[in-house]
């Protein structure tokens, strides 16, 4: 298999591709340059030496000499030492006080925790000794519900089942007279099925043209494939609206 140069696929700036060798990563060839610790340290030393030079010049000048004499007269150095000593002693005293308070809090006995007394239920004297009055005798309540008579009882008594109408009222039958319903005989509801009559069947004879068309088979709608695929595509989708250009001279 042939070696493929993938650099040809990278974007180019003129004739130079952006994708170069990997050995350039981390060096000064990158955009912005590499970070150098040596240059940073040399810059710091240069700044320190410059400050030292200006300070020594100011200290050795006449103004610096007068300032030193004034500080000696006011005993400035002794005051600074006394202030530092007092500050350190104050911090030590505060630390000693905190430690002593911790020790005293641990040595002192803890005060006993007082438990709250249990709640006492109070009973009012008025409600004490009262009892529910006991009845002398038990009373039983009996309720009677008037229900309609059963079907057998209604037939035995010969009672009408509906409310009688005054103009259509008739005498009530006796107690032992049977009650019957005189119904007309059932009508013959079954009907004979009606059969349809014979219908004439029309026979049509195919024409000769239809027979020839059936013998020749279905026509093919697909165009004949040619050697050029563009002509085949044009025969499928069409060429659109045909336009005719004519030049006329007036």
Swiss-Prot record:
Residues 103-148 are annotated as: Disordered. A motif (Nuclear localization signal) lies at residues 131-135, 245-248. Residues 48-74, 233-239 are annotated as: Interaction with hexon protein. The record marks 33-34, 239-240 as: Cleavage. Residues 36-53 are annotated as: Involved in endosomal membrane lysis. Ubiquitinated by Nedd4 following partial capsid disassembly; which might play a role in intracellular virus movement during entry. The modification Phosphoserine is found at residue 124. A motif (Nuclear export signal) lies at residues 67-76, 231-242. One of its GO terms (cellular component) is host cell cytoplasm. Keywords: Capsid protein, Cytoplasmic inwards viral transport, Disulfide bond, Host cytoplasm, Host nucleus, Host-virus interaction, Late protein, Microtubular inwards viral transport, Phosphoprotein, Ubl conjugation, Viral capsid assembly, Viral penetration into host cytoplasm, Viral penetration via lysis of host organellar membrane, Viral release from host cell, Virion, Virus entry into host cell. Induction: Expressed in the late phase of the viral replicative cycle. Pfam families: MCPVI (PF02993). A motif (PPXY motif) lies at residues 148-151. Belongs to the adenoviridae protein VI family. This is Pre-protein VI. It comes from Human adenovirus C serotype 5 (HAdV-5). The lineage of its organism: Viruses, Varidnaviria, Bamfordvirae, Preplasmiviricota, Tectiliviricetes.
């Amino acid at each position: 298999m042939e070696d493929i140069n993938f650099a040809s696929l990278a974007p180019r700036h003129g004739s130079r591709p952006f994708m170069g060798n990997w050995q350039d990563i981390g060096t000064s060839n990158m955009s912005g340059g590499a970070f150098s610790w040596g240059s940073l340290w040399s810059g710091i030393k240069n700044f320190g030496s410059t400050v030292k030079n200006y300070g020594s010049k100011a200290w050795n000048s006449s103004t610096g000499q007068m300032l030193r004499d004034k500080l000696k007269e006011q005993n400035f150095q002794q005051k600074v030492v006394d202030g530092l000593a007092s500050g350190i002693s104050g911090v030590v005293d505060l630390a000693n006080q905190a430690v002593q308070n911790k020790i005293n809090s641990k040595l002192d006995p803890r005060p006993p925790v007082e438990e709250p007394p249990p709640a006492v239920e109070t009973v009012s004297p008025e409600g004490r000794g009262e009892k529910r009055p006991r009845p002398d005798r038990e009373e039983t309540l009996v309720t009677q519900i008037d229900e309609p008579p059963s079907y057998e009882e209604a037939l035995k008594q010969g009672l009408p089942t509906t409310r009688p109408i005054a103009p259509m009222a008739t005498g009530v039958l006796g107690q032992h007279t049977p009650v019957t319903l005189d119904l007309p005989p059932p009508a013959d509801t079954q009907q004979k099925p009606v059969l349809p009559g014979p219908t004439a069947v029309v026979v049509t004879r195919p024409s000769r043209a239809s027979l020839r068309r059936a013998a020749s088979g279905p026509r093919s709608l697909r165009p004949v494939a040619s050697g050029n695929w563009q002509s085949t595509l044009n025969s499928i989708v069409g060429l659109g609206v045909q336009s005719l250009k004519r030049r006329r001279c007036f």
